């Protein structure tokens, strides 16, 4: 049987606008049962979420997973901190890098890979306003070039 492709649950599209992505990592996500069901239904939001290292463990903060509709009193808290699973050596390398000024761990997307929930984490540096303006200007220039090329063809 063929492997099923990764199923993306949600993306943090604003992260690429607000940060320079330096490196990306894959981490497992520790979830409760109702959280898995909500994620499979696509009811999650990565806006304003971030990861931090505390006591040698990696935690995902501010990720909103809506309560499961059919869940009863055993439902989960929507914005609870969720543990991320990575090798200890990777966590320590990230800890050293996040000590640098201006670097942060930002989740880019949540997806299912072989039935397990994963998070794509990025080591990112915040953009200044003029960097964002430069990116927008480049994008507009590329659009103009594509529009002109399409008009000639």
From Swiss-Prot:
<comment type="function">
    <text>Required for rescue of stalled ribosomes mediated by trans-translation. Binds to transfer-messenger RNA (tmRNA), required for stable association of tmRNA with ribosomes. tmRNA and SmpB together mimic tRNA shape, replacing the anticodon stem-loop with SmpB. tmRNA is encoded by the ssrA gene; the 2 termini fold to resemble tRNA(Ala) and it encodes a 'tag peptide', a short internal open reading frame. During trans-translation Ala-aminoacylated tmRNA acts like a tRNA, entering the A-site of stalled ribosomes, displacing the stalled mRNA.</text>
</comment>
<comment type="similarity">
    <text>Belongs to the SmpB family.</text>
</comment>
<dbReference type="GO" id="GO:0005829">
    <property type="term" value="C:cytosol"/>
</dbReference>
<dbReference type="GO" id="GO:0003723">
    <property type="term" value="F:RNA binding"/>
</dbReference>
<protein>
    <recommendedName>
        <fullName>SsrA-binding protein</fullName>
    </recommendedName>
</protein>
<dbReference type="InterPro" id="IPR023620">
    <property type="entry name" value="SmpB"/>
</dbReference>
<dbReference type="Pfam" id="PF01668">
    <property type="entry name" value="SmpB"/>
</dbReference>
<keyword id="KW-0694">RNA-binding</keyword>
<dbReference type="GO" id="GO:0070929">
    <property type="term" value="P:trans-translation"/>
</dbReference>
<dbReference type="InterPro" id="IPR000037">
    <property type="entry name" value="SsrA-bd_prot"/>
</dbReference>
<keyword id="KW-0963">Cytoplasm</keyword>
<dbReference type="InterPro" id="IPR020081">
    <property type="entry name" value="SsrA-bd_prot_CS"/>
</dbReference>
